Amino acid sequence: MVAYALKGDIPDIEVFDKRITMAMLEKAVFDRRVLVFKAADIIMGIARWNYFWDSIPFLNMLYVPDGYTHHGVGIALLRFWEEEMETQGYTRVFTATMSQERGQHFFRKFGYCDIGNLYNDGAGLELILEKKIQMN
C-alpha cells in the first residue's frame, strides 16, 4: 500500500536514501514529499520529490530494493505520485535518471519523454524526462 511517509518511517527510509542529509529527509517527510510502499509494516519502496523552478514537481528518488522489484511496487509509487500531483493542479512532472541506468526505460514506458540532459561532473550524463498529466 502506498502512503505518505510518517516520522516513524524515517529510520527505514534513511537506509535506502543516502542522497540527502537526515535534516533534509526529516523536512521532506514533514512537508509530505515522501511516499512509502508498505506491506506488513515493511517498506518495500520509496518516492521522494521536490520542485524544479519551485513550480514543477520533480521526482528526485524512486527506489525499490532488490527483492521487491518486478512486483509492481515502483509502478504503484509512480502512479500514486502522479495522481497526487494532478489532484494538486499540476499539468506536468519531471524526473531524471543517469543515461547508463535502466530507470530511463521504466519512465518512458509510462509516458515520460526526454526533454534535455545535464552532464553530472564525473558521474556521466543525466537525462531529464517530462510527463504531461491531465486533469480528469
What are these regions (language model features)?
Residues F94-A96, C113-I128:
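Conserved catalytic-core motifs of GNAT/GCN5-like acyltransferases
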Residues L129-N136:
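Short beta-strand-to-coil "C-cap" segments at the C-terminal boundary of structured domains/repeats
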Residues L78, E101-G103, N120-E126:
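Short glycine/proline-centered loop/turn elements that form peptide/ligand docking sites
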Residues M85-M98:
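Conserved GNAT acetyl-CoA-binding A-motif
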Residues H70-E83, R108-K109:
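Conserved acetyl-CoA-binding loop-helix of GNAT-fold acetyltransferases
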Residues Y4-N60, P65, G116, N120, ...:
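Acetyl-CoA-dependent GNAT
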Residues L62-H70, M98:
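A short, internal acetyl-CoA/4′-phosphopantetheine-binding micro-motif in the GNAT/acyltransferase core
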